[in-house]
Amino acid sequence: MFMSQIDKLRKQIDKIDFQILNLLKKRSKIAENIGKEKKSNNLFRPERQASILRNILKKNGNNLNPLFILSFWRSIFLSQINVQGGIKLILSNNISKKYIKTIYDYFSHDIEIITMKSNSKALEKVYNGKNILTILPYPSNNKGAKWWTNKRLEKLYAIAALPFFLRKKKSPSLIIISKYKPEIEKDSYFLYKSKYPIRDKNMILETKSNKYYLYRSNNMINNNDLKIFGILPKHYES
């Protein structure tokens, strides 16, 4: 009797598994059609992914571990980006070794990673390629995080920061760079670069390097002395 009940429950699980598979197939088809309709070269939309994840986490309550939800949906996101054409991730050797777990947690283990000798080479690939991203240390006062003054970045954008789950009052460790200008969502924050110190109650100074200032704000600010460095989805605070 006991085993008979277990068999019934297992059959229910099998049925749910097939339902999940069929729903994923439908989702992939819709994603493919979206890719055809929008006719955009930019396949990676972190602000859209962040919005989806927040909505799912709100629905979840405390039923499932948020890390499981992140892992599951990241795999879905990447598989459907691959259906539309795929993306590549270029990393310098020092980044790939130190932060590989954080990167895989964000993109899933299926992401294609190409390593290069330097940040400059990685930025060059992003600038000249299509749907190529690179990841660099989040701008800070640390020695290895001063790359953001590189002239190559004048036509590139910061589009997201890692990790997605971030404890309150903690700073991100990594930032994603793309050639495609990011979209503005309601849960976004802005990074601005300036040659001058700016006094504005809506901005905070993230870091300073080589006579440049990097500011962060939750608002779009119109100031001729500020240049958009990035538009990033806000983190999910835990």
For the regions a language model picked out, list residue spans one by one.
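Domain-level signature for soluble enzymes in the chorismate/prephenate branch of the shikimate pathway
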Residues: 2-238
